[in-house]
A protein has these predicted regions:
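Metallo-beta-lactamase
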Residues: 1-104, 139-226, 245-252, 303-325
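Cap/insert and terminal regions of metallo-dependent hydrolase folds
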Residues: 2-13, 110, 136-138, 142-145, ...
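Divalent metal-coordination and catalytic microenvironments
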Residues: 67, 77, 115, 122, ...
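Active-site metal-binding loops of divalent metal-dependent hydrolases
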Residues: 78-80, 116, 142, 192-195, ...
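Glycine/Thr-rich phosphate-binding loops of Rossmann-like dinucleotide-binding domains
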Residues: 84, 121, 147, 199, ...
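Active-site metal-binding motif and surrounding structural segment of the metallo-beta-lactamase
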Residues: 89-139, 143, 154-156, 242-248
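A short acidic, amphipathic alpha-helical/loop segment
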Residues: 124-129, 146, 150-151, 233-237
Length: 329
């Protein structure tokens, strides 16, 4: 078993942890910046790669990215629900619709699931992907039981720094994943450390692990940081993977700092994480879709610009995408 697991629960090696549940009511007395009920989004299919070597990364919203490659299509933390909470009628309401409709998604070969929080793990979406595409679900230790409850069958559970070479052939009984897959190309997925916590209820805290993923396609590397506070693990990511082409880094849900600092980075910390991992380019995520904390929906992007300037980083090196917008590698 993992060296960051003890007495039935996972933990962050540096001692960081979320605030205890009994402190959550204090959030009711914080000042919340206003959010709109809805922000218009133009939903459209994502553009396909124009060549076998091109990778297209589309921001669907929050922590959901569609990564299209000729080696197979990948989706991260897919959430298409209207609320990020249990039962479908509780939890923060979505204010930006997904940039790509579920029915417009291309065939998905891999689903990457960073942890079990409702804004990252939507069982209805996972169930729909399982039914439609029979993809392989790659997650962290302790999450398989939850996924099986949604009918998911092809599950790979990884510990931090564990690598899974990804076979592109469908398992027996599964339908073909993608007719445009290039034979012989391979995707490698490595679980990476994050500083966070897990819980679906008040009674299962840290029973399942959290993390991020490094996606290696040929010699190109895309880092999906998952949900994380700032910590020394980012330097370790950069040490283990010295040629990251693109990093997807959370920049939102960070106020108030007394409650969020250990588990969510603010934009200044996100810029430092970008520097630590040594990415050629980073794209911000985890903002402007669900009202999780007290800052306004647009403040993370504005603060990212200020932090980028203060650090002397070129504007193009760490950007954000509009919901539904794509970047090409």
């Amino acid at each position: 078993m993992s060296d960051h697991f003890d007495n039935g629960r996972f933990f962050n090696p540096n001692g960081a942890d979320a605030q205890p549940f009994w402190k959550a009511p204090r959030m009711l007395f914080e000042h919340y910046a206003p959010w709109p009920a809805q922000v218009p989004v133009v939903q459209r299919p994502s553009p396909p790669p124009t060549s076998s070597d091109e990778i297209v990364v589309t921001f669907i919203g929050h922590a959901t990215f569609l990564i299209q490659t000729s080696a197979g299509n990948i989706i991260t933390d897919p959430v298409f629900a209207q609320r990020a909470g249990p039962f479908g009628w509780t939890g923060p309401r979505r204010v930006r619709q997904p940039g790509v409709r579920f029915d417009d998604l291309p065939p998905i070969a891999y689903v990457l699931l960073s942890h079990n929080h409702y804004d990252h793990c939507d069982l209805e979406t996972l169930r729909a992907l399982q039914h439609r595409d029979h993809p392989r679900f790659v997650t962290l230790q302790g999450n398989a039981t939850l996924l099986r409850s949604a009918g998911v069958t092809r599950i790979a559970e990884l510990d931090w720094w564990q690598r899974m070479p990804a076979e592109m052939s469908a398992m027996p009984g599964a339908q073909t994943l993608d007719p445009v897959v290039t034979p012989g190309r391979e995707i490698e997925i490595t679980a990476t450390q994050a500083q966070h916590f897990s819980a679906r209820t008040p009674f299962d805290r840290n029973r399942a692990l959290w993390g991020g993923f490094m996606i290696t396609i040929d010699e190109r590397q895309i880092y999906f940081a998952g949900d994380s506070g700032y910590g020394p693990h980012f330097l370790e990511v950069g040490r283990r993977f010295p040629r990251i082409d693109l990093a997807l880094i959370p920049i939102g849900a960070y106020e108030p700092r007394w409650f969020m600092k250990d588990i969510h980075m603010n934009p200044e910390e996100a810029v430092q994480a970008h520097i630590d991992v040594g990415a050629r380019r980073s794209i911000g995520m985890h903002f402007g879709t669900f009202r999780l904390t007290t800052e306004g929906p647009n403040e993370p992007v504005a603060a990212l610009g200020r932090a980028r300037s203060a650090a002397g980083i070129d504007d193009a090196a760490f950007t954000t995408l509009d919901v539904g917008e794509s970047a090409r590698l």
